Amino acid sequence: MQTASEEPCATRGNGPIIAAMPLYNEEETVGSVVLQAKRHVDKVLCLDDGSSDASARIARKCGAQVHQHRYNRGYGGALKSIFSIAREQDVEALVILDSDGQHDPDDIPALLAPILDGRADFVIGSRFIDGGGGDAMPSYRKLGVKVISTASNMASNLGIKDTQSGYRAFSRRALKRIRFEQDGMESTLEMLEECASNDLTVHEVPTVVRYDVPKGSRFTAMSHGFTVLSYALVSLSQKKPLLVFGAPGAALLSLGAGIGMRALNSVNQLTDGTVSLDVGPGLTAAWVGMLGISLLFTGVILHAARHTLRRLLMTNFGIE
């Protein structure tokens, strides 16, 4: 379990428990997912994100409450609407799962358990802890998820093993505190940052994800990975500039100094008293050293500016 604070989680109240799923042209699978999910929750909510097929009609016939976007707003945009509806309905807990059949609705009780017994505010169905896994998950995708998770964890300090799992559950407390701006898949990381900032307790439970579904992810692995990794690196650079800029800068400065020393040691004195110096290594040392100094100073300045801004916010507004 990853804990942002030792503050106890909210205990169970009287609100409904809802399973919700973004919906975008999933007419082949949404019906079975809704019917399975209904067995474990009080209500199933589908957010139709501009589908052009019969997804919304099928979801309604299977008993789901359907809300629709007039045009596609992206995964994060769909989640924003789901969160808003859940807050309006004052739900006790909200489970998010995919409508394409990748997530097993029978795992819903396992995701809800840590929330309903007060152990967690936010639960992630993880493929990378004992008992979890991905049915024929490509190795390149595993590597990509682990790289993204590493960058995200360096920024949030939560230690989550599967930051990209879309199978998630939220307590009422989490729904009230989590706010996110991204409309794309980056919202998965933004939520974790919000958990760290708002002292919410995060827990992972094992789940198995299928990859042999009719359509699978709406995003290609490359575009998804690049977009989310870019967000993770930007977030990390904002929160830990000394690590992102200062450490590489110091390394480059040391490398430049080493190249420069080798260049000086290779100076040859000719028989006529003149000195021969290989210009190439000297120029390389200068360029590498200047780049290192620039990165190092950038990291130091951003680090100082971040801490100054935090002090000002704390002093004037009480915001940490």
Short names for language-model regions:
Residues M1-G13, N157, Q182-E320:
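Hydrophobic helical membrane-anchoring modules
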Residues M1-Q36:
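N-proximal low-complexity "stem/linker" segments adjacent to membrane-targeting elements
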Residues N14-I17, Q36-L45, A54:
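Short loop->beta transition adjacent to catalytic acidic/histidine clusters or analogous donor-positioning motifs
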Residues I18-P22, L45, Q68:
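Short hydrophobic beta-strand elements that form part
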Residues E28-S32, D53-C62:
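Acidic helix N-cap motif at the loop->helix transition within catalytic regions
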Residues D48-A56, G101:
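A conserved acidic beta->alpha catalytic loop
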Residues Q65-E88, A93, P105-M185, Y211-V228:
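Acceptor/aglycone-binding surface of glycosyltransferases and processive sugar-polymer synthases
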